[in-house]
Structure formats: C-alpha cells, structure tokens
C-alpha cells in the first residue's frame, strides 16, 4: 500500500485526495490548518489527518504541496529534512520547478502539476511537468499513472505550463462566465431562476456530451446541424459573429496567457 499525502486540503488538494482515495493500493493522509477541511475529507474519502506538515512528509510516499504560492517556500523548507526517498508534487501556480528544488535542497525528485477545478467532481484536466532530471522512469510511470487515473492528463515541458494554465487552468472561469450569461438571458425570457440555471447547465453538459460522442464530427458541423436556412438559430450565430464573440474569447485566453507568463518568470 502506497501513501499519498497532501499539505493543504482545500478545494484543489481535497479534490485530488478524493480521487486518489478511490484507487487501489493507495491510502491518503493530509494536513491543513483548518481542521474542518480534514474532517470533511475524512468523511468523504477516509483521509487520515496528520498533526503537522512534517508528519505528512515522514509518512507519505508522494507529497502534494497544495498551499497558496506565497506559502510554498516555508512549507517545503520545513519538510526538506524528511524528503529522502520521497516524491514531491507541487500545484502552486507560478512556482517553478527550479524554485521547488531550491527550497527542498534538491533532496528528492519533484513534479510540477497544473490541475483545474472540475477535478473537484472527477472531470478535471491536469498538466504534468516531468522535467526534473532526477526523476527515474519508475517514478515518472507512477505519477503519470496516478494522475491519469483521476483526470485527463497531458505531459508538458515546464515552458508550456503557462499555455495550459491560460487555456485549461483558467478555462472554467470563462465557461462559468458564459453560463452566467445564459442564465441571465433565461431570466429575461421569463424563466424562473431555478429553471434558467438548470436548463443552462444541461445545455452546456449536453452539447459537450454530443461532441464527445461524435468525435469524428467537426464542431462547426454540429453547430450547423442546429441551424436551418432562414431560421432563428442562424440569425443568432450571425449576431455572435457580428459582435466578435469568437475573437473576444480568443483574446480573453491570450490576455490570460500573458499574465501567466509574467507569473511564471523567475
């Protein structure tokens, strides 16, 4: 039995712990200053709470650093004497692999990951950076298998993490922004808030499911399948084009990417 430990058990750390807990041959432990967080995870996935960060480092085979970026240095330096033979994983945005290795005194291999919030419901995407030259093939296979089992996972060089961050890490914020707009227009059209919200969410989920179930069909074809010549749907699509919706979405992600590059600069 292998042990996966997380220092930080908030939304993202908790989501990953919950996913790992479902896998065979893994048990989960964690520490968070907020006892309510570890209590909730104990009920949800059987997490065993630790008294502090050092206990996690001592007992876990794989240690997830799931704290805010400004706290990473202090946490990693604190547990550094206990990392021999361990595998360190960091999800802190903007904290480079080089910095993680420096904080740990290069006492163990490290992996940088970039998940997104749908991981909280088992529908996440995750980028893995396996650039650390001290990672052996067995460790790479272990971490890739682990995260592939709980999310849609891609392996990227660290230089490409900002692209993933802007596109996929921040992507849920943009989807929810669009979802809010659909709910708002539902209200304007006379639906109750409950119905507008429920229908808008199902619209998003159902449309994506249709695309996933028909991988050979281009998205443009699926769009045109909704639009009849001279009908109302094509008028709406043309209005989106007139307003530059496609370009606005592209520029939104590119602006996010520029900021992600700034944050990743050492």
Sequence positions of predicted segments:
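NAD(P)+-binding Rossmann beta1-loop-alpha1 motif at the extreme N-terminus of oxidoreductases
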Residues: 1-59, 103, 123-124, 185-189
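Small-residue helix-packing motif on alpha-helices
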Residues: 38, 56, 72, 192-200, ...
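NAD(P)-dependent Rossmann-like dehydrogenase/reductase catalytic/cofactor-binding core
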Residues: 201-266
């Amino acid at each position: 039995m292998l042990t996966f430990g997380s220092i930080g058990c908030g939304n993202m750390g908790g989501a990953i712990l919950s996913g790992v807990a479902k896998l065979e041959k893994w048990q989960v432990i964690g520490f968070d200053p907020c006892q309510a967080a570890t209590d909730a995870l104990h009920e949800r996935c059987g997490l065993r709470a630790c008294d502090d960060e050092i206990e996690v480092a001592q007992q876990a085979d794989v240690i997830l650093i799931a704290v805010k970026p400004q706290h990473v240095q202090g946490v990693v330096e604190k547990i550094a004497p206990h990392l021999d033979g361990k595998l360190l994983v960091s999800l802190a945005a903007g904290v480079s692999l080089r910095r993680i290795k420096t904080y740990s005194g290069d006492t163990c291999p490290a992996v940088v990951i970039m998940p997104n919030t749908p991981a909280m419901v088992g529908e996440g995407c995750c980028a893995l950076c396996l650039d650390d030259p001290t990672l052996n093939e067995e460790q790479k296979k272990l971490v890739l298998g682990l995260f592939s089992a709980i999310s849609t996972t891609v392996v990227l060089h660290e230089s490409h993490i900002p692209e993933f961050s802007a596109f996929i890490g921040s992507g849920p914020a943009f989807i929810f922004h669009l979802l809010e707009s659909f709910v708002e227009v539902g209200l304007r059209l006379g639906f109750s808030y409950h119905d507008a919200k429920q229908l808008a969410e199902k619209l998003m989920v159902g449309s994506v499911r249709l695309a996933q179930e028909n991988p050979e069909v281009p998205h443009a074809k699926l769009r045109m399948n909704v639009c009849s010549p001279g009908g109302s749907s094509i008028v709406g699509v043309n209005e989106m084009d007139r307003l530059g919706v496609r370009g606005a979405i592209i520029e939104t992600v590119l602006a996010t990417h520029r900021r992600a590059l700034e944050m990743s600069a050492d």
